[in-house]
Design a protein with these regions (language model features):
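Non-catalytic cap/lid and distal C-terminal segments of serine-dependent acyl enzymes
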Residues: 1-250
Length: 250
């Protein structure tokens, strides 16, 4: 089934409907995917096909995916204004507009999707996920709107970003029933001299804090795989099993 491409507030959306959507009246859980849906884009990997196979085998519920175009990920996916470490001599900054973008996701995009498609709108049926900065903004949005996004996936999330750990550690987190999946390579950022050197230690710190404050062992999972690189190709391989853990009730 080909994806549906449409515009919402001048932003491209790529909608991947579950198989059999038009042949039934069933309602489906929704997963909002950053970076134009790169984690499930058939051009980038075979992840979507694996998801379809798991669903056909009754190992994963049918899911509706919404790939969301970013106008500028360095602005929309970053929680705070900070020097752009990728262009240190340019004077450019990360825009720090994550709060505006998260509000758009929760209060504008989600109601639109729920009104147009047959969705299960409750938080336990609403997921959000992304890679790198996309993982960062997914966790940020999930923690900012726990009553909206009940299933959160971060693949090599950029927790090296200045201020994000402090922001998370000042939150008053309660047992919201959320599930949070995080993964990263065991040596991502090692040898770097910029802020990315904090990728692994900050990710572990976030996991431990959340585990001790509001989440339980059965509601948060961190997977650390063998890799020295910040690799999309490696991180994306874990998407099917992450979705199984996030959406299959144990």
């Amino acid at each position: 089934m080909l994806p549906i491409v449409e515009l919402f507030q001048n932003r491209k959306l790529t909608i991947y409907l579950p198989e059999g959507y038009y042949e039934s009246e069933e309602r489906y859980a929704v997963v909002y995917v950053q970076d134009d849906g790169d984690l499930i884009d058939p051009k980038d990997s075979d992840v979507l096909q694996k998801i379809r196979e798991l669903t056909a085998a009754n190992q994963l519920p049918g899911l509706l995916f919404v790939g969301i175009e970013s106008f500028d990920r360095n602005d929309e996916y970053t929680p705070f204004i900070s020097p752009n470490i990728f262009e240190p001599e340019s004077g450019k900054q990360f825009g720090g507009n994550a709060s505006v973008y998260a509000d758009f996701l929760a209060n504008e995009l989600k109601p639109y999707i729920d009104s147009k498609y047959r969705t299960l709108p409750t938080r336990e049926h609403t997921g959000i996920m992304g890679f790198s900065f996309g993982g960062l903004i997914s966790v940020y949005s999930g923690l900012r709107y726990p009553d909206v996004f009940g299933r959160v996936g971060s693949f090599s999330g950029s927790f090296w970003f200045p201020g994000i750990v402090d922001w998370i550690e000042q939150l008053s987190i309660h047992d919201t029933g959320q599930r949070l999946y995080m993964n990263l390579g065991h040596a991502e950022g090692f040898g770097r001299t910029n802020g990315q050197q904090w990728m692994v230690p900050n990710s572990k710190r976030v996991y431990q804090y959340l585990l001790q404050n509001g989440f339980h062992e059965d509601s948060i999972r961190q997977v650390i795989y063998e890799s020295n690189f910040h690799s999309f190709d490696l991180g994306v391989q874990y998407v099917p099993e992450a979705l199984q853990w996030l959406f299959n009730e144990e």
